[in-house]
C-alpha cells in the first residue's frame, strides 16, 4: 500500500518508502524511511536512515516504530527496531565509538546505530 500521512507533516530532502504511516506534526529532513515504518505524532528525524520492516504487520494505534515526541539525528535504525516515546538520539556528548549492544545500540565514527530488533524504551537519551 502507499504511504499514508495523517494531519500536517513536514518532509524535506527525504525518501519515504511504501506502506509507511506518518502522523501529525512529524518533521522528516534529509532522511530515508524504509517500508512499513509507523512514525508517531511530533517526531523529528534529521539525517536518519530507518531500514523499516520486511512485511506489513497488523498494529494497534499504540504500536509504532518511532514513538511520539521522539527526536533522532544522524542515526541508522536497523530493521524491526522499536523506539519509544520521547526518546532523544542526538549524541550530544559527541561520543565517537562505543558498543552498547546490551542496550540495543552502538556508536561508530559518531553515528548512532540502533540494532535490528532492539527496543529503545520511552524517555531514553543517547
Question: Language model features by range: what are they?
Answer:
Residues 1-126:
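Left-handed beta-helix
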